[in-house]
A protein has these predicted regions:
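Short, solvent-exposed secondary-structure junction/capping segments
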Residues: 56-75
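Short acidic-aromatic low-complexity motifs
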Residues: 26, 31-61
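Sec/Tat-exported extracytoplasmic proteins
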Residues: 37-44, 62-66, 88-95
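Extracellular/lumenal ectodomain signal focusing on beta-strand-rich modules
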Residues: 65, 104-106, 155
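Surface-exposed, charged secondary-structure patches
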Residues: 83-129
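Soluble non-cytosolic domains of exported or imported proteins
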Residues: 23, 27, 49-52, 78-82, ...
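Hydrophobic membrane-insertion alpha-helices, especially the h-region
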Residues: 5-22
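Short beta-strand edge/turn micro-motifs at domain boundaries
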Residues: 114-116, 131-163
Length: 163
């Protein structure tokens, strides 16, 4: 009986430990950042409906007060929530393919309700009738937990290597 009880206690401790880790703020921010990146990856075979769903997923990750700054070769701009939603919709419907990879993700918890994710990024896009464009740079996401306990992006920065 003691061996069985010990075995059950060990199994329960492992399960509880895994759940605590899985639902920690850092892991939630990492999973949601991965989800954001997936909304920017477009396969040529994706249907228009599937691409529109990516815009829904993308905007659900954003706080209403989100700001975004892009500073890459030959392009600089700032975006609000409405701008990001419109631009993402245009993007997913007007590219043939897009591949965004984020490496060396570092998550710093700034407080109980704020976190910062930094990553190296590599992005390549093929537009309709346009040569493939590529950019390497840094991606920074500031996340904040809202009153409902959901993590949302409050600021996003995409900087080219030379910036």
């Amino acid at each position: 009986m003691n061996k069985r009880l010990f075995f059950v206690v060990v199994i329960m401790a492992v399960i509880v430990g895994f759940l605590i880790w899985r639902y920690s703020d850092a892991q939630i921010v990492k999973r949601q950042s991965d989800m954001l990146i997936k909304t920017l990856n477009i396969a040529g075979s994706e249907t228009k409906s599937f691409r529109i769903l990516k815009t829904n997923t993308f905007t659900n990750l954003l706080a209403n007060s989100v700001t975004c700054r892009v500073d890459i070769a030959n392009y600089r701009s700032n975006f609000s929530y409405d701008d990001l939603e419109a631009q993402h919709h245009l993007f997913v419907n007007n590219v043939d393919t897009s591949s965004l990879k984020a490496n060396n993700m570092i998550i710093n918890k700034l407080s109980d309700s704020e976190a910062k994710l930094s990553a190296d990024m590599s992005w390549s896009v093929t537009g309709k009738g346009v040569d493939r464009l590529s950019e390497n740079g840094k991606l920074t996401l500031l996340w904040k937990k809202n009153t409902a306990g959901k993590w949302r992006i409050t600021h996003m920065e995409i900087n080219g290597i030379d910036h």
